[in-house]
Amino acid sequence: MNFEKLVSQAVNGDRFKIFCGQLTEFTNSLAGEREAIEKGMRQIETQQLEAETSFTERIAEDRVKCAAQRESLERQLQDLTATDNKLSEQKRDWEERQEKAYDELMSYLENEDVDSAGTQFGDHFNSLIKSMNNLSHDSMNGQFNSLKNNLDELNIEKKQLEVAIADQSSTISEMIPSLRPTCGATYKERNTLRIIFHYQVAKLRSEYQKCRLQEEALKARLST
């Protein structure tokens, strides 16, 4: 064998010892490098496992958050839909009440015999003139007082009519602003919620892609 031949050809035992020492040193150095490489690979595997675990946990957390946000948005949408339906129903109710109040006002004005009040006053006045020509001074005073009382009653009825008209007008004026929505979600608000939800989903996808790139980079480092 070449090794035995080399030993047999050595000048002295010292050279062989030196050779064996160098061989042992080289072997130990090689073993140390191998151990360092294996340690580095274990560290990389640990880091990769930690990264994968962190990524999995992050994905799970994001999914929980997205599910909670989606549930919250769905509840908000249901609440807004219910509010919108309620407002629509209130609007229809106010419209019906406004129309009813308007019809009642028109009917009241039509049925209120304002012209007959003037005619009645004229009849009383003509009757007074006729009575003045036929009655004594005391009777005339009595008729005058009666006419004055009738005139006062007509003025009271006139004021009552004016108050009723003012009340109906005030009621109509109060109903008109109430028809305008005071709460609930407009199209702009619903669109804003949709954009926010879309942004959260896009952000989650971006984070997922970033983690995937980190994973591919770690795999590439392990394969080299």
UniProtKB/Swiss-Prot annotation:
It comes from Caenorhabditis elegans. The gene is syp-3. Interacts with gras-1. Interacts with brc-1 and brd-1. The keyword Coiled coil applies. One of its GO terms (biological process) is meiotic chromosome segregation. Plays a role in early meiotic events; during prophase I contributes to synaptonemal complex (SC) assembly, synapsis and chiasmata formation and stabilization of homologous chromosomes pairing. Required for restricting SC assembly to bridge paired chromosome axes. Required for the timely progression of meiotic crossover recombination. Required for the synapsis checkpoint. One of its GO terms (cellular component) is synaptonemal complex. Residues 63-97, 137-171 form a coiled coil. Disruption phenotype: Elevated levels of embryonic lethality and increased frequency of male progeny. Chromosome segregation defects. Lack of syp-1 and syp-2 proteins in meiotic nuclei. Impaired homologous chromosome pairing. Lack of chiasmata. Increased levels of germ cell apoptosis. It is found in: Chromosome. Keywords: Chromosome, Coiled coil, Meiosis. This is Synaptonemal complex protein 3.
